[in-house]
């Protein structure tokens, strides 16, 4: 998450270098003890993907990571060994979180530290005090984030209601305090004095300068500079927007809840579903929300029924449209109050795009680059129908084409693909890939009692080529009752340099006190300073392995890509270790944050990467070249059926988002339906008919208009950049495991976190010889750079059946 000024988004007890060396020796002994248990099953053909000069412990780690995810028996032995030898610890090693009451202590201790920093900043008067101000405020932000980010995660993921409630209270306490700080004018005044003083700013590192500007921007966004009356209006508008947005997202409603048709006209729809919705008088009530209308549009043969269901399912209630239009008006007024011409201009001012005009340039350029592919797809569907295609025909004829393809091309091989994608082999493949590209790998680590929130959570330590510990990942990947099903990456604590002053302060407070609350730290070998290491949680909802041997959790190709996507976010956190937490890892511009994760999806099915991990769970046979080619043909075939039209739909949504949020505050009431149809008529190849009464108003179901207001373009923007990097840096897969390509990407993009302008990252990784970056045209960004990214296009990648 990113609150304003002090922005939240994690460590074993602090030790000296000698202690770290002892710990490494202990880890090596532990790994050796598992060497026998981790060996391949008898009869398996073992192909060694580890370099010949690799250490024995590295080979054991490589096999162990597969077993801890695939074998419940092995996992029980592995996890219980630490449980019988270690003292209990707190959640994610946080020394306070050994019980629900610990959340209150954690929040209060952090609050006291925050208050001490605030007092120091407000009292600053000497040159030296102003020179430490950027770091002081970054530490203040970190203290808030420590509580807010971790509590926010635990209250959602922990199965114990008492822990959930305690985490919620800690979250609320610190969030309320953060809001107080965001309106503390003295902090803003002092920071501005520091920035304006050349004798201060000249002593700051580039990171400190960037963080200072970020904090000033955050203060500005909280209306801190406004007179009291205007500030109160700002607060009121913000509250109104929050309430309207929540209602808009949580209460979508169609104008009609159902469409009544003759039951006999539903031929093609599953007869069991027809029976569920059939009424006594031979009619059927087709609901206009949920799965049934989507299935009807795919399968009902009668075009008139499809038309009626389509129009009704895309027409919102007047009440829902009123919520949206009030939300847009309030946002426009908020922007005007803040000195911006529109909400889009306010939101985009610190993004790569900078302005709504630049986003529109990107999107219209993307429409042009996608148009030929769309026409090809629609022509194929029109030929199937034999007459002009209508919007309500698309899903129906796409489904027919997919079924034809499946019957004619899909072989038994494709249905067997998940047999080669056990969760353990995929995690093993990720570790091998990271080792090849970036010189880091994933090492299973036994968690201490109390460290994880559920017994099936696996802990992975990330280590570099010198076996130095650089990050912690908690993998909560298996399904359980009441667990949120959506895959996600959470940064529980950002990386950051811990000053000697903080270490001394901790020692003076309490013998048991720890400068990182007990969570993972390491000594930087270059600067000899203590660092808090990034601590990450990956959450998915995969099936558990069989309890007593047998079949592990097998993933579909889509699930493999999802896991690679989330690990792309984690990689950004792992390698983007800055000295200040405000710009570490994924804390970058919204329209740059998805680049590492989207790019990682390309690696998932690249042949050279598949050779690192895709092996049959039972026989250990590798995925054959023929099967890899079949997967590629399958993706290409599905992409050619509907990939470009799906891309156009995403582009259209982004254009609608920009149109809504670029309206000036004094432009009067917004007719969201008229604007939606104007955009669709200009840019959609298959727009909704505008002459129906009432006209369709699909925008009422577009919940992302609240959460991603003015930034919905970000994902497809990063997709376009990722496609370019995949082609030009990683050779469209030919250099997918090439160390030079990986180092180039790490050096120019990942290691900076949010400490470098995104355009500089893109220009740097492409290099000056790349035609798209001729004369360094991308470095400064701007309208033409946005158009250039639009010309790169989206292709049809990412589509699989």
Swiss-Prot record:
Chief location of this protein within or outside the cell: mitochondrion
Keywords (A to Z) from UniProt: Hydrolase, Metal-binding, Metalloprotease, Mitochondrion, Protease, Transit peptide, Zinc
GO BP field: peptide metabolic process; protein processing involved in protein targeting to mitochondrion
Matching PANTHER family: MITOCHONDRIAL INTERMEDIATE PEPTIDASE, PROTEASE M3 THIMET OLIGOPEPTIDASE-RELATED
Positions with a binding annotation for Zn(2+): 565, 569, 572
Species: Aspergillus clavatus (strain ATCC 1007 / CBS 513.65 / DSM 816 / NCTC 3887 / NRRL 1 / QM 1276 / 107)
Subcellular location: Mitochondrion matrix
GO molecular function: metal ion binding; metalloendopeptidase activity
InterPro entries, per the entry: M3A_MIP, MetalloPept_cat_dom_sf, Neurolysin/TOP_dom2, Pept_M3A_M3B, Pept_M3A_M3B_dom
Class of the enzyme per the UniProt entry, highest EC level: hydrolase
Source organism, top-level taxon: Eukaryota
Residues annotated as the enzyme's active site: 566
Targeting signal (transit peptide) range: 1-41
Cofactor binding notes: Binds 1 zinc ion.
EC number: 3.4.24.59
GO cellular component: mitochondrial matrix
Name by which UniProt lists this protein: Mitochondrial intermediate peptidase
Catalytic activity: Release of an N-terminal octapeptide as second stage of processing of some proteins imported into the mitochondrion
Family assignment from sequence similarity: Belongs to the peptidase M3 family.
Pfam family, one: Peptidase_M3
Segments for region (Disordered): 31-54
Cofactor field: Zn(2+)
Function: Cleaves proteins, imported into the mitochondrion, to their mature size. While most mitochondrial precursor proteins are processed to the mature form in one step by mitochondrial processing peptidase (MPP), the sequential cleavage by MIP of an octapeptide after initial processing by MPP is a required step for a subgroup of nuclear-encoded precursor proteins destined for the matrix or the inner membrane.
């Amino acid at each position: 998450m990113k609150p304003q000024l002090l922005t939240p988004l994690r460590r074993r007890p602090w030790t000296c270098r000698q202690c770290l060396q002892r710990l490494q020796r202990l880890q090596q002994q532990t790994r050796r003890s598992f060497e026998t248990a981790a060996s391949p099953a008898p009869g398996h053909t073992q192909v060694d993907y580890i370099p010949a000069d690799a250490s024995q412990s590295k080979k054991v780690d490589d096999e162990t990571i597969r077993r801890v995810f695939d074998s419940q028996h092995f996992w029980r032995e592995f996890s219980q060994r630490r449980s019988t030898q270690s003292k209990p610890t707190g959640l994610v090693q946080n020394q306070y979180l050994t019980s629900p009451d610990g959340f209150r202590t954690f929040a209060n201790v952090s609050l006291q530290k925050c208050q001490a920093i605030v007092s120091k900043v407000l009292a600053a008067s000497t040159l030296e005090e102003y020179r430490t101000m950027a770091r002081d405020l970054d530490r203040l932000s970190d203290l808030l984030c420590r509580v807010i980010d971790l509590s926010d995660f635990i209250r959602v993921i922990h199965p114990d209601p008492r822990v959930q409630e305690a985490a919620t209270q800690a979250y609320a306490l610190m969030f309320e305090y953060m809001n107080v700080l965001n309106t503390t004018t003295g902090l803003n005044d002092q920071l501005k004095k520091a920035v304006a003083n050349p004798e201060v700013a000249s002593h700051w590192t580039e990171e400190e300068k960037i963080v200072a500007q970020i904090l000033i921007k955050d203060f500005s966004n909280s209306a801190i500079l406004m007179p009291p009356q205007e500030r109160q209006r700002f607060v009121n508008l913000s509250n109104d927007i929050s309430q309207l947005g929540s209602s808009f997202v949580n209460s979508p409603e169609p104008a009609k809840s159902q469409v009544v048709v003759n039951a006999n006209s539903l031929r093609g729809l599953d007869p069991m579903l027809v029976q569920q919705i059939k009424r006594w008088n031979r009619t059927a009530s087709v609901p206009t929300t949920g799965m049934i209308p989507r299935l009807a549009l795919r399968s009902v043969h009668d075009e008139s029924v499809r038309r009626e269901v389509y129009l009704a399912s895309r027409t919102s209630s007047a009440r829902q449209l009123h919520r949206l239009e009030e939300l847009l008006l309030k946002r426009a007024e908020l922007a005007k109050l803040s000195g911006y011409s529109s909400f889009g201009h306010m939101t985009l001012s610190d993004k790569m795009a900078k302005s709504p005009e630049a986003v529109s340039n990107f999107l219209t350029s993307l429409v042009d680059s996608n148009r030929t592919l769309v026409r090809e797809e629609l022509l194929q569907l029109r030929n199937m129908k034999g007459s002009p295609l209508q919007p309500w025909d698309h899903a129906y004829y796409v489904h027919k084409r997919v079924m034809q393809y499946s019957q004619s091309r899909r072989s038994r091989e494709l249905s067997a693909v998940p047999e080669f994608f056990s969760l353990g082999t995929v995690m093993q493949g990720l570790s091998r890939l990271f080792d090849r590209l970036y010189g880091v790998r994933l090492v299973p680590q036994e968690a201490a009692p109390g460290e994880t929130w559920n017994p099936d959570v696996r802990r992975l330590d990330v280590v570099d080529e010198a076996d130095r510990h650089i990050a912690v990942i908690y993998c909560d990947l298996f399904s359980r009752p009441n667990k949120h099903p959506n895959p996600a990456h959470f940064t529980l604590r950002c990386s950051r340099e811990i000053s000697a002053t903080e270490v001394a302060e901790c020692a003076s407070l309490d013998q048991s006190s720890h400068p990182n609350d007990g969570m993972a730290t390491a000594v930087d070998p270059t600067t000899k300073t203590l660092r808090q290491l990034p601590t990450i949680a990956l959450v998915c909802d995969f099936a558990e392995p069989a309890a007593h041997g047998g079949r592990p959790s097998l993933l579909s190709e889509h699930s493999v890509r999802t896991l690679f996507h989330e690990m792309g976010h984690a990689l950004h956190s792992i390698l983007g270790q800055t000295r200040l937490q405000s710009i570490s890892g994924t804390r970058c511009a919204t329209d740059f944050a998805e680049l590492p994760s989207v790019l990682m999806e390309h690696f998932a099915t690249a042949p050279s990467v598949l050779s690192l991990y895709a092996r049959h769970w039972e026989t250990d046979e590798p995925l054959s070249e023929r099967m890899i080619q079949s997967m590629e043909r399958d993706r290409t075939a599905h992409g050619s059926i509907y990939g470009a039209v799906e891309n156009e739909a995403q582009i259209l949504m982004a254009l609608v988002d920009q149109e809504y949020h670029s309206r000036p505050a004094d432009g009067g009431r917004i007719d969201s339906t008229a604007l939606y149809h104007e955009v669709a008529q200009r840019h959609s190849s298959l727009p909704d008919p505008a002459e129906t009464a009432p006209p369709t108003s699909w925008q009422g179901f577009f919940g992302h208009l609240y959460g991603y207001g003015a930034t919905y373009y970000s994902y497809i923007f990063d997709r376009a950049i990722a496609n370019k990097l995949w082609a030009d840096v990683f050779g469209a897969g030919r250099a997918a495991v090439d160390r030079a390509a990986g180092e180039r990407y790490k050096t120019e993009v990942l290691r900076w976190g949010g400490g470098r302008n995104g355009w500089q990252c893109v220009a740097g990784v492409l290099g000056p010889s790349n035609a798209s970056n001729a004369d360094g045209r991308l470095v400064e960004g701007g309208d033409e750079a946005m158009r250039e990214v639009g010309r790169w296009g989206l292709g049809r990648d990412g589509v699989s059946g």
